[in-house]
Amino acid sequence: MKSVAQTVIEADRFYTIAAHTGNVIQAVEGSKDGGTVRLGKYDHKPEQEWSFVREGDGVYRIRNRASGKLLDLTMTGTANGTWLHLWEDVGGTSQMWKVEHTPEGTVRLRSSWAGGKCVDTVGIGAEVGAVLQIWQEVPGGGDQLWVISEVKDRIKRAAKVEQAAPAAETKAAPAK
């Protein structure tokens, strides 16, 4: 994976979390507890954007913008292959993630609950539709490296849409 600029995580901001393919972590069924989390092509949707709620030194709860639900471990699992899903904030350690920066500017997301296992993809795939799981660290494992990027263009895009919309025509009132 090539080097990328390191993103500083700040409160009250939203971010995408992208695999080496550019596909991002997204909530597929984000409005319900147990909602699926998969990779998808970034379409500027709130289901694909996340905030990081600081819990301690490099430890965060990762909250989905659309639903407010947290990235969590299915059944509070700790084994390799435990899937990730969304769940309401229950204050549990299975919802806490250590953000570990690499020299290349990527990060590993490590479960605070599952002995530091890394967010990974099922089947070593980072294509659209890949399901997320935890797995022990695999040296050189590109599927465990993520790029966190701040979402900056949402306001700019909205302003462009407003500017592009034709102004309403004003007609003079008919003479009486």
Label for each model-derived stretch:
Residues 1-176:
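Lectin-like carbohydrate-binding module/patch detector with strong preference for beta-trefoil
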